[in-house]
Amino acid sequence: MLKQFLNQYDTIIFDMDGVMTSEQAYWDAAALTVWEYLKWNKDEPINAPECMENLQEIRKKIFCDDQLIAVLKEKGVNSNWDLAYITVCMAWICGVEDDFSAVLEYARNMSENILNYYDELALLCSKKTGFDYDWLQRNHLMWQTMQGIFQEWYLGDRLFEEQYGYVPRICGKSGLLFREKPIIRLEILQQLLCELSETKRLCTATGRPSVELFQPITDWDIKKYFALDGFCNYDHVVAAEQGKRTLTKPHPYMFLKALYGTDYPDERILNGDYDRSKIKTTLVVGDAGSDILAAKAMGADFCAVLTGVAGQAGRKYFEEMQAEYILNSLEDFLIIKT
């Protein structure tokens, strides 16, 4: 049975990572990307299946029992491509190969907003290594190469070739995407979405590209509960931005696109040409600051779930931001009889 506060909403829009989907597979891919890239730059070949077997040991070493992930996320690193990239830059600056404790300490002493520090980091890295500054900059050749390696690990050989049209540089990667598990119990997630879909339009607004969204929700047999035109994802953002503007969260574009339908013209959304009355009966569910900021910019009610990277520590932030609801997880949407 659904909790009563949900009765007032006709549409529910879900962020995915930290809400339904876990970021664990992405962090695994980031660790393997760092490992492979550092080896590659020393001309040391890797064995992909062997790396998969030793994945937990590699991740523990690279991210210092995930402490490095937490520090970098707190300092504004939202993209997992950036997580891998900045870890390699810091490893080169610190001159480390196996012991990443120095990298963790370096990260702790960095600016509170690392997003403003990328160029300086690339410059320091250039001075330390002798590598070309332009090559080292974010979104330039080094970053692009690492992004490709990340996608190889995450998608696996078959999906990567289908998406990008060429064979991975190193084959034998089975794809971490296929190992994904929901952040709450699958049977509870299925029950929740089934009950919600009986009276509400369900949508997604996620930074994942379509293939990374559809694979897990298809595997978990929950895709059928969402509106066919309600799957807003990163592909829609790229198409709408056209290289001219930034429409990722905290911009409200993704939530608006999900609400009014992926066929609704982007220009009408961006020009404010839509029925605002629908927003009053829309609930946005997310786990991050960018989610609540986008919901507020849109004018929708917001429900925070504390299953993201910050966990229970995020409660104070969402209280200060005046979220309408703060729940431990999506399971709290249901009245579960024991």
Predicted regions and their residues:
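Active-site neighborhood of HAD-like aspartate-dependent phosphohydrolases
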Residues: L2-C64, D82-Y85
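Short, acidic loop-to-helix structural element flanking the phosphoryl-transfer center
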Residues: L2-K3, I13, F131-D134, G148, ...
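Short beta->alpha linker loops
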Residues: A25, R208-P209, P250, D287, ...
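Non-catalytic, alpha-helical, charged scaffold/linker segments
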Residues: N41, A48-F160
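Substrate-recognition "cap/lid" segment bordering the active-site pocket of phosphatases
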Residues: L176-I184, Q190, C203, R208-L283, ...
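Short, charged/polar "capping" segments at the starts of alpha-helices
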Residues: V211-F214, A310-R315, I335
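Short acidic-hydrophobic, aromatic-tinged amphipathic segments that line or gate anion-handling sites
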Residues: N233, E324-F333
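Acidic, Mg2+-coordinating phosphoryl-transfer loop and its flanking beta/alpha structural elements
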Residues: L283-Y325
